[in-house]
């Protein structure tokens, strides 16, 4: 397997996870426990990291949905994929910071950072 193909496969995995996040933020029909976790944690992350935006929790949810849609578009397009991976890595850094500030487990964001980092490294 070539390194570019490996990077593309990892990118599609992150694309799929971002699409799952969009779905989980909008409805709990397919992922009830993931949706519930996002709904419970969103107000905490809003207070810990995004307080300076001064927006409601529901508005922040749609900001996250928009960001995840943007990540999907960037990772789907071969021309934009390299930028999309770097953009995603930056966003995951914010998520990791938020986890640390709230005393949450950093493992989910670290796994995603590792996957994105590997996709960037082999590209």
Curated annotation (Swiss-Prot):
Signal peptide, first to last residue: 1-24
Consequence of gene disruption: Abolishes the production of xenoacremones A and B.
Topology within the bilayer: Multi-pass membrane protein
Top EC class for this record: isomerase
GO molecular function (one): isomerase activity
Protein's UniProt keywords contain Membrane: yes
Domain of life according to the entry: Eukaryota
Keywords: Isomerase, Membrane, Signal, Transmembrane, Transmembrane helix
Transmembrane segments: 58-78, 102-122
Metabolic or biological pathway, per its Swiss-Prot or TrEMBL entry: Mycotoxin biosynthesis
Entry GO terms, CC: membrane
Cellular compartments annotated: Membrane
EC number: 5.-.-.-
Family statement drawn from the similarity comment of this UniProt entry: Belongs to the cyclic ether formation enzyme xenC family.
Summary of the function given for this chain in its UniProt record: Cyclic ether formation enzyme; part of the gene cluster that mediates the biosynthesis of xenoacremones such as xenoacremone A, a compound that shows inhibitory activity toward the PI3K/AKT signaling pathway and which has the ability to induce apoptosis of A549 lung cancer cells. Within the pathway, cooperation of the hybrid PKS-NRPS xenE and the trans-acting enoyl reductase xenG is responsible for the formation of the reduced tyrosine-nonaketide derivative. The alpha/beta hydrolase xenA then accelerates intramolecular nucleophilic attack to give a pyrrolidone derivative.
Name of the protein this chain belongs to: Cyclic ether formation enzyme xenC
Gene: xenC
């Amino acid at each position: 397997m070539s390194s570019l193909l490996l990077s593309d496969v990892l990118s599609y995995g992150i694309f799929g996870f971002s699409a799952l996040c969009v779905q989980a933020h909008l409805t709990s029909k397919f992922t009830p426990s993931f949706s519930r976790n996002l709904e419970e944690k969103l107000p905490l992350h809003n207070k810990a990291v995004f307080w300076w935006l001064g927006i409601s929790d529901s508005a922040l949810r749609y900001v996250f949905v928009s960001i995840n849609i943007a990540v999907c578009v960037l990772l789907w397009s071969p021309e934009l994929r390299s930028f999309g991976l770097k953009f995603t890595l930056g966003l995951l850094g914010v998520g990791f910071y938020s986890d640390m500030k709230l005393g949450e487990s950093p493992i989910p964001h670290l796994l995603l950072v590792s996957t994105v980092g590997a996709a960037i490294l082999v590209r």
